[in-house]
Amino acid sequence: MMCLKILRISLAILAGWALCSANSELGWTRKKSLVEREHLNQVLLEGERCWLGAKVRRPRASPQHHLFGVYPSRAGNYLRPYPVGEQEIHHTGRSKPDTEGNAVSLVPPDLTENPAGLRGAVEEPAAPWVGDSPIGQSELLGDDDAYLGNQRSKESLGEAGIQKGSAMAATTTTAIFTTLNEPKPETQRRGWAKSRQRRQVWKRRAEDGQGDSGISSHFQPWPKHSLKHRVKKSPPEESNQNGGEGSYREAETFNSQVGLPILYFSGRRERLLLRPEVLAEIPREAFTVEAWVKPEGGQNNPAIIAGVFDNCSHTVSDKGWALGIRSGKDKGKRDARFFFSLCTDRVKKATILISHSRYQPGTWTHVAATYDGRHMALYVDGTQVASSLDQSGPLNSPFMASCRSLLLGGDSSEDGHYFRGHLGTLVFWSTALPQSHFQHSSQHSSGEEEATDLVLTASFEPVNTEWVPFRDEKYPRLEVLQGFEPEPEILSPLQPPLCGQTVCDNVELISQYNGYWPLRGEKVIRYQVVNICDDEGLNPIVSEEQIRLQHEALNEAFSRYNISWQLSVHQVHNSTLRHRVVLVNCEPSKIGNDHCDPECEHPLTGYDGGDCRLQGRCYSWNRRDGLCHVECNNMLNDFDDGDCCDPQVADVRKTCFDPDSPKRAYMSVKELKEALQLNSTHFLNIYFASSVREDLAGAATWPWDKDAVTHLGGIVLSPAYYGMPGHTDTMIHEVGHVLGLYHVFKGVSERESCNDPCKETVPSMETGDLCADTAPTPKSELCREPEPTSDTCGFTRFPGAPFTNYMSYTDDNCTDNFTPNQVARMHCYLDLVYQQWTESRKPTPIPIPPMVIGQTNKSLTIHWLPPISGVVYDRASGSLCGACTEDGTFRQYVHTASSRRVCDSSGYWTPEEAVGPPDVDQPCEPSLQAWSPEVHLYHMNMTVPCPTEGCSLELLFQHPVQADTLTLWVTSFFMESSQVLFDTEILLENKESVHLGPLDTFCDIPLTIKLHVDGKVSGVKVYTFDERIEIDAALLTSQPHSPLCSGCRPVRYQVLRDPPFASGLPVVVTHSHRKFTDVEVTPGQMYQYQVLAEAGGELGEASPPLNHIHGAPYCGDGKVSERLGEECDDGDLVSGDGCSKVCELEEGFNCVGEPSLCYMYEGDGICEPFERKTSIVDCGIYTPKGYLDQWATRAYSSHEDKKKCPVSLVTGEPHSLICTSYHPDLPNHRPLTGWFPCVASENETQDDRSEQPEGSLKKEDEVWLKVCFNRPGEARAIFIFLTTDGLVPGEHQQPTVTLYLTDVRGSNHSLGTYGLSCQHNPLIINVTHHQNVLFHHTTSVLLNFSSPRVGISAVALRTSSRIGLSAPSNCISEDEGQNHQGQSCIHRPCGKQDSCPSLLLDHADVVNCTSIGPGLMKCAITCQRGFALQASSGQYIRPMQKEILLTCSSGHWDQNVSCLPVDCGVPDPSLVNYANFSCSEGTKFLKRCSISCVPPAKLQGLSPWLTCLEDGLWSLPEVYCKLECDAPPIILNANLLLPHCLQDNHDVGTICKYECKPGYYVAESAEGKVRNKLLKIQCLEGGIWEQGSCIPVVCEPPPPVFEGMYECTNGFSLDSQCVLNCNQEREKLPILCTKEGLWTQEFKLCENLQGECPPPPSELNSVEYKCEQGYGIGAVCSPLCVIPPSDPVMLPENITADTLEHWMEPVKVQSIVCTGRRQWHPDPVLVHCIQSCEPFQADGWCDTINNRAYCHYDGGDCCSSTLSSKKVIPFAADCDLDECTCRDPKAEENQ
């Protein structure tokens, strides 16, 4: 309410503010539609009875960032909220800051006076939430061991029998360090190998049967000092920064006191340059670079880890190579991945390889790149994720080697593109190593050969021996890895499907709950009915009889599914609460927000505070007259100025509608829950509330909502339906939602569009309601199968509809069951989320069978997952162990959040949204689940920008800790700059803070910040200028071994076997890595293993069994087993590397060998046999036997401009296969990769467009494209290749195309209308489904588009190749056929052409011409040396292609080709910077061009020639143009201090020093207090000297009060003498200006001065003056303009505000002073008022008021040359032509 009042007061001022940019308006439109869609979801349709259950959710893009998103959760994932202490339970209300920062209570005072009455008995503190999966070393927590049964004596049993020291070695990865002085074949390894090698470590250990001796000698160390390298066994993990006990076991060759030195780059000016003497020559013909990195979340774009860059040209170029992180193509600040770019000196554009998936922040990753002179490849964790053949030859000539530098942490540009994160090792080779080197070195025997190619192993201790800071920057932080290493990931975590929310949606996991009945064992669940009575305990909301009947119905429905309910009733005695109407989804902030909110349209809210309807006219004399007038009781009249909320005047229970009043008659469900503070940790709480629509029966909280087990969770039911006969199934339905069940009609009636990926057409566990035993069905209240329906998505029948299911909308007399899949989901969620609702204290089950991870003849090693709830400690009541990881790290989400920013009137995006775990479903899209500083004014399309100091959000954590990392989820932002956070302030416990400055962030990867601060961290404050930023959550992670985790006891595990172990007892495993090696095994014997968890003396259910025959193959053994149906086996159980954890090929990958080597094959430029039919990118369109494919040879369009949108681009093969969503700059991007319609929309205003339906076209703007084909035939398919699908982000109407085929007689045949989507590119239309077209011979295709934003790159036609039918169709009579819009595809007359004409090609060899049938012939064409193919029609020929196969059919060759001389074209300027090229001989094959430098650049090198080579590229340059400066110019009034500066040929960066002569100083220091005498000028990158001069000393002018009282001999210059005129007999001594720029004495007023100035004239020139000091001499008056908003300025005598020209720039007057002559200075006659500038300069809109010099010409918004979009958008609709023109005299238009 306070927000709204402030906005109303400010409305007149804000109304003058301009909008943000055009894209800003689009952003708000999307956000506003989100709010309206949320309203729509919450305002229920007719017959709706369930609120939250009906809410449509979009598929989540990043489930790993959400609560319960993966199982088991990674160390980098985030914990669930733990309950607050008991002191929090007593609070009856929460407070939020108002705009002044004061707390405003949300709960009325009379509710806070009696907290006991609200709560009844205070429940016990909730048991803690469970923690993460066990992934760290648990040395902190106790024995890391295994033993038999419950005995404490250790008995030898395989790995379990190893003594403690050895056991640790057997369950952790060992770091080994050695030298390469005497290399051995089995020890030659570089970098760290892929994690799959861990499997071999285990196999070897099992064979040896003992500790350290079992470590394979094949594994090599990490680089240490010179020429040392290490195999990947596992990624490193840093110890705490204070050097505490770590997590590495050191081998005998490793000094544990030293550790492994690594670098941490903070992302701020920490680039390192390799010293030239370290590496004689950087490899240029072939190389391999390997690096272990641990990147932070949030990076520069791009962020360079390492690279080789040009150090001679001083211009930004792609020459060299770079390895780093960047956003995916056309993705903005999202989808960041590892990349490898490379550009030889022969080409002008780099080739960029991008990884197949996002990088993982905070995870050690092995990244490698190779180049062999032809093939470049990128490897991530040993998998080849991208490759290319686009570059060839050496990187540079030998002469240019001196111009290349190796950098770490950034590139050589001014921006730096700094990397942020850890760099562990860097290894450099002079050869391109094979993929096996990165994965399976133990099988690789070329170690000695490779060692000779090793040229650099980076050493970081001491770092300055090999590296030096680049450009005077600083060294990165040096850290040391010590101690034991956390166990690496063995199994990829289970994740939900695309349409899922949690791991209970994972098909593999939920199938176990379906098939293994012990997981669905008996569960007794507690629930609590919250029954509110009056103060005397009378008049409860629901009766005891209602409660009894409902309880019986609940148990009757669930008990047959092993779920029973335990009832408790919580009575609240509070008359105030009892007499208030509680409304679902109607927050007080919505009342009177100038927008009718249907959910608040209730009589007791005054019909939304008058927003929905007014009761009549309110007369002013009725307000505040001691009576409540219904017509005045609204927000517009301030609710009768308080009369209607005065208990002395009216019955406030019926008349008080003011949302700010503590007496109001209504409250929201959220306020009720806030007042009661009933935590949902131990109970499912049942509340009662009404709704505006009486048919709302209930609302529930999803189990994945972050409020599910807080005081804001539970179920809200209508008391009118609760426990009433015929309505008891309503609560059963809502409980189903709480336990994770969707409506059975989800995916049919609940879907976003016809293309919704979660649409359900057949029963499925991955779409719809995620249950395969509930058939798709529409929403219906009829107790029968629904009738077939026909809607916009087509005609659909619904056989087997589950209308009797509790999750349908049928009545109680019809619903009677849950399906087995639904029962499995409910049991899963009870274990995953609600385990503390049960009486049982036993651990939750392990729902996945154990898995085999190692096997020898004598042993078998198994691994298992933790309990599904993630329990890693005993659940001690009241402890914080649920927030601890196994290394003693304590992690916590935000506890309280606040912002001084005024809240949006919609009630969304409040600071509270940033409390708790992240819950935004779709990162990078606007969401209602995040905080945003956006304030929108309804009806004005205006958002209020952040103030000059920025918008801020303060986030506080409950427990201050010694912090290690801060994680921040910034899920959406609008600013183009990545640094949307211009400052991040870390708040410390001692009230101090540390400012980190700006940080780069992505919207789909959380921002992680490594904290190096002293003291305990208590919170963080972030600052931004982006008013549309959205922040979802923040997580604070402590350093290991936190005192808050010191008392936590880990869970133990019991391993059961059938047949039993020799002792007859289960094996108890206490170590945290959940592994066990069984050495009591016999080959060929079948064994069954089960694991159960033990905690607090209780045993959980045994896991589903693993059945394995010892010696049999298994997934992960590195051998592809056909018997198991394996498609690959790379030796691990990790997905995302090409071979999934179930040994299936992943999409886009191919795997070869054993263990499998996997690589991405799509787009690598190589057409392999297995992809010939499927890969259009590598192999082109596959033409089946019996068909012919042809590309369009001619094209016509409705809108064509041969320069802007040439339609010829759609002929031939597509120039690009990349399809993207539409953005306005796409049609202007060069080079064009496709045709875009030239629809004249530039002059169309925003209002014009808003009146049209989304994506629609006006009649005159209809877009059509007609393409013609040379060879008419019977059409079988049409292929349409898209450049863009025309879909604008935020819009949902899919663009379409309607197709017509035109036959040889000119008749059109419709093929229907099809949606366009980049997900289906090319769009393939199967013509065989259209019988009316099959036997017509198609000559052209007409395409009509629904949107002008579509881009087409090519169209292809597939026809039947049957000769008998196609031969007569090759021609058409001249007088036949119709054309479209006057454009004809008729291209030749009829005539008999049965024989193939001879191929007579110059400069070509015709070889192997063979006849393949009557009228059919094939010829292979090869051009001579120095010639290349060129096509005049037909398919697109690759540049410099020399061979082609031509086919002749019915006398017609399929292509017209010729062999033309290779022409390299004029050399691109990027080949040699600052050079001119002279090509007097031409630019064809073997011709030469000379190189000359553009002054002042000087030629370096002896061979200034380029030669055109056979591949169409120029030879490598062997010279460069070095920018040098001549001798610097003479500096007047200065003496040169460095004599060598008088010479010529100064390198860029050279500094010359001068000393200014006495009485002069450096011009740049004129504004500073200290006047510098020493002048430095630098040779700049343009080959010119920096400007510099020495200027005379000038003293400060005397204060204005002395104006007109002094006379000076030479102004205020050096040695000038000034005399004050005081009219005294005694003459005053002169005051001198000294060479220091100071007066010899202070100017003082004459002693005899008296009197005062006359009062300034009132309102002269519309200015009035405020004279608080009076009018005496020296008094100051402040000018104020009578008409705001205006500024007082000083104008010349002959100029007024009306005659002021736009190019004049007057000076603003801050004050006037009464001088000693009793006159005002400046003269008030010269002070005028002109209109103030609006605070929207440089916002993308041309504001006419700002288009003048005084306002800096609106920051460039009114000139196309100064706009990034190059398009001026006038803000005012009636903008005068002159006002909106480009007036800036400095703009290009006015030069």
UniProtKB/Swiss-Prot annotation:
<dbReference type="InterPro" id="IPR000800">
    <property type="entry name" value="Notch_dom"/>
</dbReference>
<dbReference type="GO" id="GO:0060349">
    <property type="term" value="P:bone morphogenesis"/>
</dbReference>
<keyword id="KW-0645">Protease</keyword>
<feature type="disulfide bond">
    <location>
        <begin position="1733"/>
        <end position="1751"/>
    </location>
</feature>
<feature type="disulfide bond">
    <location>
        <begin position="924"/>
        <end position="1003"/>
    </location>
</feature>
<feature type="disulfide bond">
    <location>
        <begin position="1653"/>
        <end position="1714"/>
    </location>
</feature>
<dbReference type="InterPro" id="IPR006558">
    <property type="entry name" value="LamG-like"/>
</dbReference>
<keyword id="KW-1015">Disulfide bond</keyword>
<feature type="glycosylation site" description="N-linked (GlcNAc...) asparagine">
    <location>
        <position position="1308"/>
    </location>
</feature>
<feature type="binding site">
    <location>
        <position position="743"/>
    </location>
    <ligand>
        <name>Zn(2+)</name>
    </ligand>
</feature>
<feature type="disulfide bond">
    <location>
        <begin position="1479"/>
        <end position="1489"/>
    </location>
</feature>
<feature type="disulfide bond">
    <location>
        <begin position="645"/>
        <end position="656"/>
    </location>
</feature>
<keyword id="KW-0862">Zinc</keyword>
<feature type="compositionally biased region" description="Basic and acidic residues">
    <location>
        <begin position="89"/>
        <end position="99"/>
    </location>
</feature>
<keyword id="KW-0325">Glycoprotein</keyword>
<feature type="domain" description="Sushi 2">
    <location>
        <begin position="1462"/>
        <end position="1521"/>
    </location>
</feature>
<feature type="compositionally biased region" description="Basic residues">
    <location>
        <begin position="191"/>
        <end position="203"/>
    </location>
</feature>
<feature type="glycosylation site" description="N-linked (GlcNAc...) asparagine">
    <location>
        <position position="1694"/>
    </location>
</feature>
<feature type="disulfide bond">
    <location>
        <begin position="1219"/>
        <end position="1318"/>
    </location>
</feature>
<feature type="glycosylation site" description="N-linked (GlcNAc...) asparagine">
    <location>
        <position position="857"/>
    </location>
</feature>
<feature type="glycosylation site" description="N-linked (GlcNAc...) asparagine">
    <location>
        <position position="813"/>
    </location>
</feature>
<dbReference type="InterPro" id="IPR043543">
    <property type="entry name" value="PAPPA/PAPPA2"/>
</dbReference>
<feature type="glycosylation site" description="N-linked (GlcNAc...) asparagine">
    <location>
        <position position="679"/>
    </location>
</feature>
<feature type="domain" description="Sushi 5">
    <location>
        <begin position="1651"/>
        <end position="1731"/>
    </location>
</feature>
<dbReference type="GO" id="GO:0001558">
    <property type="term" value="P:regulation of cell growth"/>
</dbReference>
<feature type="disulfide bond">
    <location>
        <begin position="1556"/>
        <end position="1590"/>
    </location>
</feature>
<feature type="region of interest" description="Disordered">
    <location>
        <begin position="177"/>
        <end position="248"/>
    </location>
</feature>
<dbReference type="GO" id="GO:0005576">
    <property type="term" value="C:extracellular region"/>
</dbReference>
<feature type="binding site">
    <location>
        <position position="733"/>
    </location>
    <ligand>
        <name>Zn(2+)</name>
    </ligand>
</feature>
<feature type="glycosylation site" description="N-linked (GlcNAc...) asparagine">
    <location>
        <position position="941"/>
    </location>
</feature>
<keyword id="KW-0964">Secreted</keyword>
<feature type="disulfide bond">
    <location>
        <begin position="1167"/>
        <end position="1179"/>
    </location>
</feature>
<dbReference type="GO" id="GO:0004222">
    <property type="term" value="F:metalloendopeptidase activity"/>
</dbReference>
<dbReference type="GO" id="GO:0005615">
    <property type="term" value="C:extracellular space"/>
</dbReference>
<feature type="disulfide bond">
    <location>
        <begin position="1371"/>
        <end position="1385"/>
    </location>
</feature>
<dbReference type="GO" id="GO:0016324">
    <property type="term" value="C:apical plasma membrane"/>
</dbReference>
<dbReference type="GO" id="GO:0070062">
    <property type="term" value="C:extracellular exosome"/>
</dbReference>
<keyword id="KW-0225">Disease variant</keyword>
<feature type="disulfide bond">
    <location>
        <begin position="1525"/>
        <end position="1579"/>
    </location>
</feature>
<feature type="disulfide bond">
    <location>
        <begin position="504"/>
        <end position="828"/>
    </location>
</feature>
<dbReference type="GO" id="GO:0008237">
    <property type="term" value="F:metallopeptidase activity"/>
</dbReference>
<dbReference type="GO" id="GO:0007166">
    <property type="term" value="P:cell surface receptor signaling pathway"/>
</dbReference>
